[in-house]
Amino acid sequence: MEVTGDAGVPESGEIRTLKPCLLRRNYSREQHGVAASCLEDLRSKACDILAIDKSLTPVTLVLAEDGTIVDDDDYFLCLPSNTKFVALASNEKWAYNNSDGGTAWISQESFDVDETDSGAGLKWKNVARQLKEDLSSIILLSEEDLQMLVDAPCSDLAQELRQSCATVQRLQHTLQQVLDQREEVRQSKQLLQLYLQALEKEGSLLSKQEESKAAFGEEVDAVDTGISRETSSDVALASHILTALREKQAPELSLSSQDLELVTKEDPKALAVALNWDIKKTETVQEACERELALRLQQTQSLHSLRSISASKASPPGDLQNPKRARQDPT
């Protein structure tokens, strides 16, 4: 928004642009929303709103995310709206705190660890950071990761991604759509499988297949039992991957792209033994995983290409200089 300034930095009658910002002290997670036209204006409001004693000035403003010192008005104007700042008094130092994934809470002796930063809380934050670095990674995430982001509190996810709650709500809606699309594909495949099974029963193909499987099983028991046991120990897939392959319908839709790649590289015979499947079923699932992986990679490459084209059209004449970093507390 724009208002006419009557005091401070701008002269009388001069139009100034106010940037909405979020401020907090180093000892509190309570933050305040302010609007400032420049850094000096933001420092002044920080002293007033956060009750910083004048004897502790000058106040240093750093980005709450990584401790970058913001002391240049041009850089300040380039920051997005609702950027989070930490106001440091003259006797305070910023310190990176890994427990909250770089949200940059300042270290204090009386700091209480947030319970949501442990266990599942850390896991969804790690996934959120991956999404923050590259939005197209949505395509590569597993259903479990997608569901964690959908279930994450909107305000916490907005803070982690440095976006507004409205933007994050739209993102969570998109993530839910991705989950719904995968479920629709899974149900379609299930219906197709049921249809094929009905055809097999109708044509007496199923009984012949069972006889063939029984004969094959007896031969394996008589000849290759020792080899099969030895082969099963060679499977390097994690337990959650094997569980998904055994229990999920269309398991390729449940796994992340990294897991899909591991499945496609696994030896079919060893995987068949580990899953207690026949070779044909194992190879069919591996082929489905390979197709799903290729589709996701193709979609990701397409997004990257579109992003590169958009960036080249809207690239600024020059890059910002590397900002300085606040020195970290050695403790």
UniProtKB/Swiss-Prot annotation:
Q: Which residues carry this modification: Phosphothreonine?
A: T243
Which InterPro entries does the annotation name?
A: CIDE-N_dom, DFF-C, DFF45, DNA_fragmentation_mid_dom
- Principal place of residence: cytoplasm
Record PTM N-acetylmethionine, positions in chain? M1
Q: Name one GO cellular component term.
A: plasma membrane
Q: Which Gene Ontology molecular function entries are recorded, alphabetically? A: deoxyribonuclease inhibitor activity; protein domain specific binding; protein folding chaperone
Residues with PTM Phosphoserine:
S315
Which intervals of the chain are annotated as region Disordered?
A: 305-331
| Domain CIDE-N as annotated: residue spans | 17-96
Where does the entry annotate site (Cleavage)?
D117, S118, D224, T225
Q: Where is the signal peptide?
A: none
One family name in Pfam for this protein: DFF-C
Phosphoprotein recorded as keyword: yes
Per UniProt, the keywords (alphabetical) are:
Acetylation, Apoptosis, Cytoplasm, Phosphoprotein
Q: Which cysteines are joined by disulfide bonds?
A: none
Q: How is the polypeptide modified once translated?
A: Caspase-3 cleaves DFF45 at 2 sites to generate an active factor.
The listed locations are:
Cytoplasm
Q: What does this protein do?
A: Inhibitor of the caspase-activated DNase (DFF40).
- Whom does it interact with, and what assembly results? Heterodimer of DFFA and DFFB.
Q: In its UniProt entry, what is this protein called?
A: DNA fragmentation factor subunit alpha
Protein species of origin: Homo sapiens (Human)
